[in-house]
Amino acid sequence: MDSIAQLRKNYTFGQLSETEVPHHPLPLFQLWFDQAVKAECPEPNSMTLATADKAGNPSARIVLLKGADQNGFTFFTNYESQKGQDLAVRPQAALLFHWHELERQVRIKGLVERVSATESDEYFHSRPPASRIGAWASPQSAAIPNREFLEEAEKRFKSEFGEAPPRPEHWGGYRLRPTEMEFWQGRPSRLHDRIHYKLDGSNWKVTRLAP
């Protein structure tokens, strides 16, 4: 651990100019995401989701992006989990994508809402049966006595539902509607490129931030 302070890297992969980016952040996100896929970045749809509880205590965890369009960024989870409890009282969140191989980050802030039951059903039934059973078996974020508790619950719900488990009411999707997005491109000498989008009415204001 003594060598942590000495870990460093020079960023030389690319550059980003505020005069060349699109007026709306979504096309740039989609371009960067596609490039992350082509570069074979590990799990390019993995993102940090940061929430806060009623008292303002923050929590962060990795979740998977399952949709990105003009309506926002979609992910799915247990509504009774810590993140679900946080979003019930504070429906604001932040997302962070880090594509190390491309020396890029994307930060997103916005308001969060549940997706429709129809949309949750559609995604839930596209998942493998074992994952659908897992949504029933795990009381996410609750204290449990041991691993056997989960395994017994899994057996019980497999016996009850077979290969066609329905979506539990406590499981579904959220959509973050962005109000701010920042695109970060690593550059030499730590003089990184940071292009910031902020929603102003129905338009996006684009500015360059100091690194």
UniProtKB/Swiss-Prot annotation:
Annotated FMN binding sites: R61, I62, V63, L64, L65, K66, F76, T77, K83, Q105, Q140, S141, W184, R194
Pfam families assigned to the protein according to its UniProt record, in alphabetical order: PNP_phzG_C, PNPOx_N
Biological role stated in the UniProt entry: Catalyzes the oxidation of either pyridoxine 5'-phosphate (PNP) or pyridoxamine 5'-phosphate (PMP) into pyridoxal 5'-phosphate (PLP).
Designated name of the protein: Pyridoxine/pyridoxamine 5'-phosphate oxidase
The record's free-text note on cofactor binding: Binds 1 FMN per subunit.
Quaternary structure annotation from Swiss-Prot or TrEMBL: Homodimer.
Annotated GO biological process: pyridoxine biosynthetic process
Family: Belongs to the pyridoxamine 5'-phosphate oxidase family.
Known catalytic reactions: pyridoxamine 5'-phosphate + O2 + H2O = pyridoxal 5'-phosphate + H2O2 + NH4(+); pyridoxine 5'-phosphate + O2 = pyridoxal 5'-phosphate + H2O2
EC number(s) recorded for this UniProt protein: 1.4.3.5
Keywords: Flavoprotein, FMN, Oxidoreductase, Pyridoxine biosynthesis
Family annotation (SUPFAM superfamilies): FMN-binding split barrel (SSF50475)
Gene Ontology MF terms: FMN binding; pyridoxamine phosphate oxidase activity
Cofactor: FMN
